[in-house]
From Swiss-Prot:
UniProt keyword Ribosomal protein present: yes
Domain S5 DRBM: 19-82
Protein known as: Small ribosomal subunit protein uS5
Family per record: Belongs to the universal ribosomal protein uS5 family.
Molecular-function GO term, any one: structural constituent of ribosome
Protein source organism: Acaryochloris marina (strain MBIC 11017)
UniProt subunit comment: Part of the 30S ribosomal subunit. Contacts proteins S4 and S8.
Domains: entry comment: The N-terminal domain interacts with the head of the 30S subunit; the C-terminal domain interacts with the body and contacts protein S4. The interaction surface between S4 and S5 is involved in control of translational fidelity.
One GO CC annotation: small ribosomal subunit
Length: 177
């Protein structure tokens, strides 16, 4: 019985080892209660496998480690599939919105790298995007910027998806542009 449990634990560890997590922000927040102020921590965590899957999670707990753990679990529940090109870029320009934040992304030539700041850079790197230009517009709130980036990445479509929706072949789609 104990041997079976060990195997299950090893399998879970192997499955989780492909995921990377990065903490974008840790904030100490307070709630006013009858006896005074109750302090807790809020962590914004980005989870990704650098192969086209990424998620943003928020966790709150009385200690930092618990908040990060909850944030990772929340991020894994909100995973987004990102279509990547051969040069590890995005297929087309995109604008994403989250709250008052607006993130503008454009594909870049191979060797350009990730030109973005703050939470946007973290989300793109953990999604596996290697060549992209991105700009944060509007809010500088890390959570809203991360969510806006996730919205933009979720809205990306490949050429084959667009051709399928229009009911034409991919070659005809290229000829039209």
């Amino acid at each position: 019985m104990a041997k079976e449990n060990r195997r299950k634990n090893n399998r879970n560890k192997e499955k989780d080892s492909t995921w990377q997590e990065r903490v974008v922000q840790i904030r100490r927040v307070s709630k006013v209660v009858k006896g005074g102020k109750k302090l807790s921590f809020r962590a914004i965590v980005v989870v990704g496998n650098e192969r086209g899957q990424v998620g943003v999670g928020v966790g709150k707990a009385s200690d930092v480690i618990g908040a990060v753990r909850k944030g990772v679990a929340d991020g894994k529940k909100q995973l987004v599939e990102v279509p990547l090109t051969r040069s590890n870029s995005i297929p087309h320009p995109m604008i994403g919105r989250g709250g008052a934040a607006k993130v503008m992304m454009r594909p870049a030539a191979p060797g350009t790298g990730v030109i973005a700041g703050g939470a946007v850079r973290t989300v793109l790197e953990l999604a596996g995007v290697r060549n992209v230009l991105a700009k944060q517009l509007g809010s500088d709130n890390p959570l809203n910027n991360a969510r806006a980036t996730l919205h933009a990445l979720a809205s990306l479509r490949t050429f084959s998806e667009v051709a399928g929706e229009r009911g034409i072949e991919v070659e005809k789609l290229y000829a039209a542009t």
